[in-house]
């Protein structure tokens, strides 16, 4: 499968990132969970490219449940696919005898599943993370990076939010399984750092998209719906008034942050990862896309569906992520809102 030019450019820019300590990965075995997903795939892609360009003698083990996607990944990248779900992952099922770095990106991210299958969402987050951490301890991993979410902050916060700030979460809410699962997984990660001396870090990502995110019609996240409207020349339809603030991050920027955390992050700590300058309301984001990406050829309209609650949308928030902590490690986001959409759409058109 041909790699879009814009995605190839993203990978090259990451390889030339001076803040990443590439030599730390030399002769290492790297386990990437959820490697058939967007973020896991992005990490695996960059590591495989670095292996060639920097002669790192890396071994990349890509874990996932979907065997078809896994075999496709093996055909495209120089990885070894580990066909197993994280809830079944163990030293025996992994077949591994070494893992120097672990990037734990696996998890249920479908909003509809959060509402319809909350037990699976919660157990995948908690039990899956415990299994990954146990495996990391058994294999003597030097670093584990857990991909968490800004949703751990819950409700009731406003203004600039740092990693030490936390809002409230209703455990009985219709989609609380996702943020509760992320909170519990983060707690496990920090606990393993304390008990076993395992070097763990938690990356609280904003809404992540960009080149490398496939145009999968099953993915109904807001950025993909907006981008599809641009391609189709249709008005952008908002299912709410769009007053909630969203914190976003370009996919390649997120991958760079995760690679930095693997070698520079402080053990047992969390880091916000987002382009704080691109934070805006959903309505404002839609207007940017209509005006700057579609060139003013489409409009933004509000059409609230009757089954709104069943769609599992996150409650509206009004906070913006503070990113000074990750920036102190040498990270800077490269792309603003319009460019993020333009690059994702360009990758779809390639």
Predicted feature locations:
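Active-site helix of classical SDR
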Residues: 177, 181-184
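NAD(P)H-binding glycine-rich loop region in Rossmannoid oxidoreductase-like domains
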Residues: 85-124
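N-terminal Rossmann NAD(P)H-binding glycine-rich loop of SDR-like oxidoreductase domains
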Residues: 29-49
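C-terminal substrate-binding subdomain of Rossmann-fold SDR/epimerase-dehydratase oxidoreductases
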Residues: 230-234, 238-350
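Amphipathic terminal alpha-helices
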Residues: 1-24, 45, 55-58, 336-350
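Conserved beta-loop-beta element that borders a ligand/cofactor-binding pocket
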Residues: 149, 186-212
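Conserved Rossmann-fold NAD(P)-dependent oxidoreductase catalytic core, especially the SDR/UDP-sugar
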Residues: 130-177
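A conserved pocket-lining segment of Rossmann-fold NAD(P)-dependent short-chain dehydrogenase/reductase
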Residues: 113-114, 167-174, 200-215, 225-249, ...
């Amino acid at each position: 499968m041909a790699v879009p030019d814009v995605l190839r450019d993203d990978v090259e820019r990451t390889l030339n990132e001076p803040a990443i300590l590439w030599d730390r990965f030399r002769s290492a075995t790297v386990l990437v969970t959820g490697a058939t997903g967007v973020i896991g795939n992005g990490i695996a892609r960059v590591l495989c490219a670095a292996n060639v360009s920097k002669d790192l003698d890396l071994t990349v083990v890509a874990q996932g449940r979907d065997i078809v996607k896994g075999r496709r990944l093996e055909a495209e990248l120089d990885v070894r696919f580990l066909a197993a779900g994280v809830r079944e992952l163990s030293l025996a099922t992994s077949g591994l005898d070494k893992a120097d770095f672990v990037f734990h990106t696996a998890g249920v991210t479908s909003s509809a599943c959060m509402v319809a299958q909350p037990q699976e969402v919660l157990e995948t987050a908690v039990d899956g993370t415990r299994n990954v951490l146990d495996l990391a301890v058994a294999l003597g991993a030097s670093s584990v990076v857990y991909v968490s979410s800004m949703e751990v902050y819950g409700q009731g916060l406003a203004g600039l939010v740092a990693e030490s700030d936390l809002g409230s979460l209703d455990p009985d809410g219709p989609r609380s399984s996702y943020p509760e699962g992320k909170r519990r997984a983060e707690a496990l990660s920090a606990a393993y750092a304390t008990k076993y001396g395992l070097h763990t870090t938690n990356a609280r990502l904003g809404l992540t998209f960009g080149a490398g995110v496939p145009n999968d019609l099953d993915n109904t996240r807001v950025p993909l719906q907006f981008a599809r409207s641009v391609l189709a020349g249709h008005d952008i339809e908002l299912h709410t008034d769009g007053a909630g603030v969203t914190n976003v991050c370009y996919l390649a920027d997120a991958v760079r942050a995760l690679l930095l955390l693997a070698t520079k992050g402080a053990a047992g700590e969390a880091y916000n990862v987002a382009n704080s300058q691109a934070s805006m309301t959903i309505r404002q984001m839609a207007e940017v896309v209509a005006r700057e990406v579609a060139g003013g050829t489409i409009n933004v309209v509000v059409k609230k569906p009757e089954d709104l609650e069943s769609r599992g949308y996150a409650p509206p928030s009004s906070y913006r992520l503070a990113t000074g902590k990750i920036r102190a490690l040498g990270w800077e986001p490269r792309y603003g809102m319009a460019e993020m959409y333009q690059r994702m759409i360009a990758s779809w058109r390639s």
